[in-house]
Amino acid sequence: MSALVASSFILGGNAMASTNVVKSPLEAVSMVSEWDKAFSKSDKVDHKKVKFKNRYGVEIVGDLYTPKNLHGKAAAIAVSGPFGAVKEQSSGLYAQTLAERGFITLAFDPSYTGESGGEPRNLASPEINTDDFSAAVDFLGTKSNIDRDKIGILGVCGWGGFALNAALADPRIKAVATSTMYDMTRVMAKGYNDSVGADERYETKKKLAEQRWLDLQNGKPAYTGAINVDPKKIDASTPQFVAQYADYYRTPRGYHKRSVNSNSGESGWTKTNPISFINMPILAYASEMRTPILIVAGEKAHSRYFSEDAFKSLGNKNKELVIVPGAVHTDLYDNKNNKIPYDKFEEFFKANLK
């Protein structure tokens, strides 16, 4: 299977070339009051829904987790990811667990997805999504129980790349961690393991440009449809990492109805979503990084090379790469197999947010 075909399961590329319009039933949702997470609620932290705006005027909705019996000002961590997920999935679990360990944490839905605002729905942008992290810092820094000089961020999967990019742009971020990271601009432009060259990339750009005409003609964006495969259709020919994504997003293990990655019907990403990712690489100034860094990846993760390459390129000597023995990419989503090194994340943030 070519890297570009493999990417389609995650990026919607298999639907991208189609001229059929997929109608989207999506619209922004109001904040849900009940607990509807893919993980159990902790009795050690207080939880509430919050909202704030990013620099582009998009309203971001998040879950704020505060340790019970907190005294004085605390350090804070903003968490988001994976790419196409919602705060009720992996990022919320990380946030709640770190709050149990003494931090005030915020898990948020990126612009245009989940409960956050923005039209059209299910759109991503390397620039806007990078700013979503800085907007989270804006919000946290206004809270009376948070020391604004002790704010860090953590990005999971594709949001690992955005987290590093945000730390490069925003010196207010005092520590940055990634878990099972992707560089979404790299994989959309070059496919897995950089196997897509200029000619194939140009053909993709032509299809994306044609899709813009179709969207204009139809007065609305077309959508890719389901991002991850139906678990019932997985067989011996299915790439292992594709099956692992389905096992998380499309089963009770991690399913959430507002998640782009969990959808099984007409939505998915906008078909033109890759345009800016292909043309605007993140981490261009990686060598100038001055923020302390922790990068965590699974030993057996198909995505491991993103973490290792990012680690090599980042200039700060205060950096650490942790390879989790035996872990695949999605093992670091929900700790199903007890692979998430929470002790390491706690140690890192306590050492650098002081």
Question: What positions do the PLM features span?
Answer:
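Conserved alpha/beta-hydrolase
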Residues: 97-117
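Alpha/beta-hydrolase-fold enzymes
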Residues: 164-251
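N-terminal cap/lid segment of alpha/beta-hydrolase-fold proteins
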Residues: 26-72
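Catalytic histidine-centered segment of alpha/beta-hydrolase-like enzymes
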Residues: 327-338
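Short beta-strand/loop motif that positions the catalytic acidic residue
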Residues: 289, 295-297
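The serine-hydrolase catalytic nucleophile loop
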Residues: 84-96, 110
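Short beta-strand element of the alpha/beta-hydrolase
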Residues: 72-82
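Alpha/beta-hydrolase active-site loop
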Residues: 123-144
